Amino acid sequence: MSERAPVVTIDGPSGAGKGTISQLLAKHLGWQLLDSGAIYRVLALAAIHHDVELENEESITLLASHLDVKFLTGNEKDPVQVILEGEDVTTAIRTQECSNAASKVAAFPRVREALLRRQRAFRTAPGLIADGRDMGTVVFPTASAKLYLTASAQERAQRRYNQLQDKGFDVNIERLLAEIIERDDRDMNRPVAPLVPAENALVIDTSDKGIDEVLELALNYINQKLSSTN
């Protein structure tokens, strides 16, 4: 890890636009990309591929320490492309089996510690865009610039509804809204690493803003922060 490599953290709730803005920033700046929300799913899939028992904390921790994963800028359908051991697993990590397995491996404290170190190892030159929920508060507390994207629960539910409809899923928007509100409450009130803006983060409400406007706000802020540290 290079402590000198700049890192920009982008935190916020699901559906606020973190994934889209993160990959656009990474592409624009030519920086590395970290999608921390996918990392437990990637680890779970690696365990399944290597026939590692999900209940074996020692084996899962070892796997986490050497996890061969890359995040690449993708396209409009999948903003972030996830590569595990050279294989595109962007779709594979979204299965229910993988989701259930991710919940199991995430319960181990040693696994969480190993993945924390693994995430910090993404901080390499020329820089890193880190997308998540506790990037600016826990993983990279000394980040060069910190952003927190948010939007109303109704707007985020509508975005998720449109996204799933485009992929051919039959979904209920009221159920999506209820799930988002429930997850917000859980994430914001959990005792460890609650979902809150970092103390010195720029908060951007994306509810009534287009992608280009949010990107411009983010870039202006990042450039300002980077120029003040040089």
UniProtKB/Swiss-Prot annotation:
Q: Does the keyword Secreted apply?
A: no
Spell out the molecular function terms from Gene Ontology.
(d)CMP kinase activity; ATP binding; CMP kinase activity; dCMP kinase activity
Q: Gene3D superfamilies per the record?
A: P-loop containing nucleotide triphosphate hydrolases (3.40.50.300)
Tell me where it resides: Cytoplasm
Q: List the disulfide bonds.
A: none
**The organism sits in which domain of life?**
Bacteria
The alphabetical list of record keywords is: ATP-binding, Cytoplasm, Kinase, Nucleotide-binding, Transferase
Which annotated residues bind ATP?
Answer: 12-20
* The keyword Transferase is annotated on this UniProt entry: yes
Q: Which InterPro entries does the record associate with it?
A: Cytidylate_kin, Cytidylate_kinase_dom, P-loop_NTPase
Q: In which family does this protein belong, per the annotation?
A: Belongs to the cytidylate kinase family. Type 1 subfamily.
Q: Which PANTHER family match?
A: CYTIDYLATE KINASE (PTHR21299:SF2), CYTIDYLATE KINASE/PANTOATE-BETA-ALANINE LIGASE (PTHR21299)
List the protein's name.
Cytidylate kinase
